[in-house]
């Protein structure tokens, strides 16, 4: 339980950064130039990298006794882990798909909301609201992970994303914003559970590899969805991207179901 809470706290700070990023970038672009937004974020990350290196203590693996590893496991549940990676890959593709075009979609389809704001400001403001909602999703995900069978809970969380992605493609103005907020809650609630599952499925000594491979699949392979979504947006319109990402989650639900079965049988 404490591990799931820890993952939620970690995710909350990540969602906070994701929420502030678009708003900060669009504000700097509007007040100065788009180059200033990139420059500021680059300098900030350089400072953050130095601070991380100086403040986080380093311990060699050989110095850490086995019993000190959280969720100490001696075996890896390979079938469950593989199915999780596959489910996470499709989740990553959906994430890259909808986040790539979410700013443009909000800018073009919220004409009656805050009409005095420019499209550029709306492209930063409304995605920020979605990511702020993700903070609530992290908390909800942690509570769900504490109370229910985590692999099964993840399957239902993935399913919950599908209707909100579809709604985002067919709504505008206030209903679009509401759909986006619920999507933020639904999507980010998967993170504390998913990260805990990696810890549950992996050998304690190989856990870092498990997390690294998971991020590679989600953010590396998942990034290909940006190009795929671009083809959809060019040929069918930006709004069509969101239902397409919802359809993309159907295989993710299937792999999450298989993961749940593999986890129960171990």
Mark where each language-model region is.
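Flexible cytoplasmic inter-helical loops of multi-pass small-molecule transporters
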Residues: 56-73
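Extracytoplasmic gate region of multi-pass secondary transporters
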Residues: 79-135
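C-terminal transmembrane helical hairpin of 12-TM major facilitator-type secondary transporters
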Residues: 148-197
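Symmetry-related core transmembrane helices of the 12-TM Major Facilitator Superfamily/SLC fold
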Residues: 37-54, 242-257
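Helix-to-loop junctions at the C-terminal end of transmembrane segments
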Residues: 137-149, 233
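Cytoplasmic helix-loop-helix junction between adjacent transmembrane helices
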Residues: 1-16
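A late C-terminal transmembrane helix in Major Facilitator Superfamily
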Residues: 199-236
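Small-residue (Gly/Pro/Ala) motifs that create kinks and tight helix-helix packing interfaces
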Residues: 17-29, 103, 225-233
């Amino acid at each position: 339980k404490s591990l799931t809470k820890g993952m939620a706290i970690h995710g909350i700070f990540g969602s906070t950064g994701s929420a502030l990023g678009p708003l900060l970038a669009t504000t700097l672009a509007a007040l100065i130039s788009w180059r200033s937004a990139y420059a500021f974020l680059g300098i900030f990350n350089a400072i953050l990298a130095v601070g991380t290196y100086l403040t986080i203590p380093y311990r060699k693996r050989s110095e850490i006794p086995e019993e000190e590893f959280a969720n100490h496991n001696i075996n890896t549940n390979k079938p469950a882990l593989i199915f999780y990676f596959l489910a996470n890959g499709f989740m990553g593709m959906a994430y890259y798909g909808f986040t790539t075009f979410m700013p443009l979609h909000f800018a073009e389809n919220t004409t009656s909301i805050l009409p005095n704001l420019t499209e550029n400001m709306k492209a930063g403001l409304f995605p920020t609201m979605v990511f702020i909602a993700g903070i609530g999703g992290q908390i909800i995900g942690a509570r769900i992970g504490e109370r229910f069978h985590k692999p099964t809970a993840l399957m239902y969380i993935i399913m919950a994303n599908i209707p909100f992605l579809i709604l985002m493609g067919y709504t505008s103005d206030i209903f679009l914003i509401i759909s986006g907020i619920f999507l933020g809650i639904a999507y980010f609630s998967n993170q504390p559970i998913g990260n805990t599952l990696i810890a549950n499925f992996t050998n304690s000594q190989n856990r870092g590899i498990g997390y690294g491979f998971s991020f590679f699949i989600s953010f590396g392979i998942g990034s290909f969805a940006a190009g795929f979504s671009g083809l959809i947006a060019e040929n069918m319109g930006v709004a069509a991207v969101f239902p397409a990402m919802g359809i993309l989650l159907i295989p993710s639900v299937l792999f999450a179901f298989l993961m749940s079965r593999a986890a129960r049988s171990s």
